Amino acid sequence: MRILLSNDDGIHAPGIQALAKALREFAEVQVVAPDRNRSGASNSLTLESSLRTFTYPNGDIAVQMGTPTDCVFLGVNALMRPRPDVVVSGINAGPNLGDDVIYSGTVAAAMEGRHLGLPALAVSLNGHEHYETAAAVTCTLLRALAREPLRTGRILNINVPDLPLEEIKGIRVTRCGSRHPADKVIPQDDPRGNTLYWIGPPGEKLDAGPDTDFAAVDEGYVSVTPLHVDLTAHSAQDVVTRWLSSAGVNGQW
């Protein structure tokens, strides 16, 4: 199995290092990751400037100022030959649950892999300690994919409780929950009296029902959420069509 491994925390982050070590026990792994923390970069792609890479002695490649999406795009289309069999993103330091997937560079890297036609996993740890647990879970899932390919055409968003492996209760297939809107902005004055602004923490849980990713992780289960790229609200198409007609918009052209 040939694996392209990326993340959004940066190439030196403990999560990607732990995962690379575990994956290399049974697979050929090429790390292509940002040279710095790019958390929250979502699906952004660098189009107005060129990208430089740096290759470490062990073969890992850092993309200077690159986003997670840049890294996967370059990895699949230029840097890993032959092309990978699967794209893995993570291990993220902290969860990507509910609405987090909209902003997450970890999920975006996996999404780019899927967009390029490859199976893709995004892996996040609900904390900052037991990376070995998330690595073991990821290895188990990848071995399963090698034995029995999953032909859903979906991204698997995996969130792992920050627990020792023996305390994990199992795996649940879940849906994304949701958070209250984040609205905290933290102002700060710099030494010259100019105001700086920091974006605050994510909102608290809003929908954490028993079938959500939030509930699974809180209860000690690995959450596996299938995600797809199509953002069309299919159930709303007829509603919007009727609204355009009743509002008289259709008759203007």
Curated annotation (Swiss-Prot):
Its cofactor is a divalent metal cation. GO terms for molecular function: 3'-nucleotidase activity; 5'-nucleotidase activity; exopolyphosphatase activity; metal ion binding; nucleotide binding. Its EC number is 3.1.3.5, 3.1.3.6, 3.6.1.11. It is found in: Cytoplasm. It is an enzyme of class 3 (hydrolase). GO terms for cellular component: cytoplasm. A divalent metal cation binds at residues 8-9, 39, 92. Gene3D superfamilies: Survival protein SurE-like phosphatase/nucleotidase. InterPro entries: SurE (IPR030048), SurE-like_Pase/nucleotidase (IPR002828), SurE-like_sf (IPR036523). Binds 1 divalent metal cation per subunit. It holds the Pfam family SurE. It catalyses: a ribonucleoside 5'-phosphate + H2O = a ribonucleoside + phosphate; a ribonucleoside 3'-phosphate + H2O = a ribonucleoside + phosphate; [phosphate](n) + H2O = [phosphate](n-1) + phosphate + H(+). Keywords: Cytoplasm, Hydrolase, Metal-binding, Nucleotide-binding. Nucleotidase with a broad substrate specificity as it can dephosphorylate various ribo- and deoxyribonucleoside 5'-monophosphates and ribonucleoside 3'-monophosphates with highest affinity to 3'-AMP. Also hydrolyzes polyphosphate (exopolyphosphatase activity) with the preference for short-chain-length substrates (P20-25). Might be involved in the regulation of dNTP and NTP pools, and in the turnover of 3'-mononucleotides produced by numerous intracellular RNases (T1, T2, and F) during the degradation of various RNAs. Belongs to the SurE nucleotidase family. This is 5'/3'-nucleotidase SurE.
